[in-house]
């Protein structure tokens, strides 16, 4: 008589030619979920760990930015360095923009490989097959690459933020930071609640109008810069600040919903960057509002 059948886990691992648990950075993600299933369709433990990774990365980004800004506010030598090397500020702006776009638009390796015809992925020898599977340079194929690019983006943003916050007094900056924290916590908890799941049905149309609002803000800023509008006017700054505060609060709400319901489990770095941008822009808008309110008083 034959012995009892092997356990399901052992049999599955032999069928797929790999152990049941992996040692890589995404070990908690089963292979069938990792590449083709959005987060909302995964098991609860996977959703929880994905949320933990996103907010851990986001917390590190915000802590690094806050620490650098605080260092700049208390260190006279760092203030002198920042003020005497304005060119470095513009370099950091360019680096931040490039790394942000790269993280945002870089295709997933699985999407790129899926677009390659099947005959090209099989060869007569192992070495040609490996050559054919080689991804383009702009595809971030490993977690380490994504994390490195996110670190470069965060450090560049932190340097730019330090120069901006030096232009305001400490009380105004702290007030803006407190208000931003309250708004972010409130919006995030609201967006993650089940009662607002139906908002996703109209997320595409909402994003359309949000993007229009963003382009209006960009147009206002460029017009003021090129044609000499009085950007120091309290009315202009208040209008610009309130428009930005409303716009990026809506962005934060929609992005939080989309991130935990419409993305894949291996996109935590991109998600953290999106939330970080929403929070930073919201903070800058609130800072502008408070600064001009103080000037009027």
Curated annotation (Swiss-Prot):
It comes from the Eukaryota. Residues 75-85, 168-171, 230-239, 292-297 are cytoplasmic. Its main location: endoplasmic reticulum. It holds the Pfam family Bax1-I. It is found in: Endoplasmic reticulum membrane; Vacuole membrane; Mitochondrion membrane. Residues 1-53, 107-146, 193-208, 261-270 are lumenal. GO terms for molecular function: calcium channel activity. The chain crosses the membrane at residues 54-74, 86-106, 147-167, 172-192, 209-229, 240-260, 271-291. It is a multi-pass membrane protein. Links the unfolded protein response and programmed cell death and mediates mitochondrial-dependent apoptosis. Induces cell death and disruption of the mitochondrial transmembrane potential via the mitochondrial phosphate carrier MIR1. Dispensible for starvation-induced autophagy. PANTHER family: BAX INHIBITOR-RELATED, PROTEIN LIFEGUARD 4. This is Bax inhibitor 1. It comes from Saccharomyces cerevisiae (strain ATCC 204508 / S288c). The gene is BXI1.
